[in-house]
Amino acid sequence: MDQYCILGRIGEGAHGIVFKAKHVETGEIVALKKVALRRLEDGIPNQALREIKALQEIEDSQYVVQLKAVFPHGAGFVLAFEFMLSDLAEVVRHAQRPLAPAQVKSYLQMLLKGVAFCHANNIVHRDLKPANLLISASGQLKIADFGLARVFSPDGGRLYTHQVATRWYRAPELLYGARQYDQGVDLWAVGCIMGELLNGSPLFPGENDIEQLCCVLRILGTPSPRVWPEITELPDYNKISFKEQAPVPLEEVLPDASHQALDLLGQFLLYPPRQRIAASQALLHQYFFTAPLPAHPSELPIPQRPGGPTPKAHPGPPHVHDFHVDRPLEESLLNPELIRPFIPEG
């Protein structure tokens, strides 16, 4: 840590605190995520390990936040990321009204390019939401927080937990307890994010899992085996029943959105996961090629995080770890292959 000067605190996540820092020799500004180990014998938290591995698999995309270095520190380790000025949640929060159509197109296009790159490399993010889409000082959107990401098994035989994704962006199959799923969970989240950008507020703001399903059903209608044959195989399908609800036309939900925008949105928000439009296909949709065209990143709003140079922390878990410990990190805790030295650019 001696090579960095801490400039302020950005926020707190599930496994550590994120700081804004400057490299002493190069002057480069970075974001340092300090990950503490509660007990040395527990080893590296799975989420932190997944984030490292996923980012090393897809480090060549300009639409994914770059992991610059990983190094041990005290009873834990530190991830050094490129510094990003804000996030899409702040953009939506600061907007006085829904974003302009050209701005929505630009953000969505950058998001889809990042998602397409991840999926092409068999990475499923599993927690796409505006707060995990960071914005650089130049307006570039990049996907961050790969703590829930997994390498996708194309044969579909692998079981995963359904307790992933932030509730408002959680796909219906996850709400019904699916243990086998694929990139479709990310595509549903993209649709939720697109709807939020068009609407200026979340499409499905449920306060618990049951209410979340109700929010979805109110707009998309009650799912049936006729529309979604696989629903009967989901673990929680028979645990709760809903009265028949007809879908509400998306043009009534988002009356100011264009026909092309609603057509693309509808292809994300489909009950059968395999029928959702792929990110690579979505980038070819007519929506992106009709006026107004996507805005240049320099034309996009870039709000500062609250607090200016010392941004307000995002809500985190009640426990706060002490990172200022002098105990050496046992070699067995950290795979040496995951440790990369800081290499200054240029």
From Swiss-Prot:
Reactions it catalyzes: L-seryl-[protein] + ATP = O-phospho-L-seryl-[protein] + ADP + H(+); L-threonyl-[protein] + ATP = O-phospho-L-threonyl-[protein] + ADP + H(+)
Q: Where is this protein chiefly located? A: nucleus
Tell me what organism the protein belongs to. Rattus norvegicus
Biological process (GO), any one: negative regulation of smoothened signaling pathway
Task: State where ATP binds.
Answer: 10-18, 33
Recite the UniProt keywords alphabetically. ATP-binding, Cell cycle, Cell division, Cell projection, Cilium, Cytoplasm, Developmental protein, Kinase, Nucleotide-binding, Nucleus, Serine/threonine-protein kinase, Transferase
Q: What is this protein called?
A: Cyclin-dependent kinase 20
The protein's gene is named Cdk20
Q: What is the lineage of its organism?
A: Eukaryota, Metazoa, Chordata, Craniata, Vertebrata
Family, according to the entry, reads as follows: Belongs to the protein kinase superfamily. CMGC Ser/Thr protein kinase family. CDC2/CDKX subfamily.
> Where does this protein have compositionally biased stretches of type Pro residues?
303-318
Give the E.C. number(s): 2.7.11.22
* Residue ranges, annotated region (Disordered): 298-324
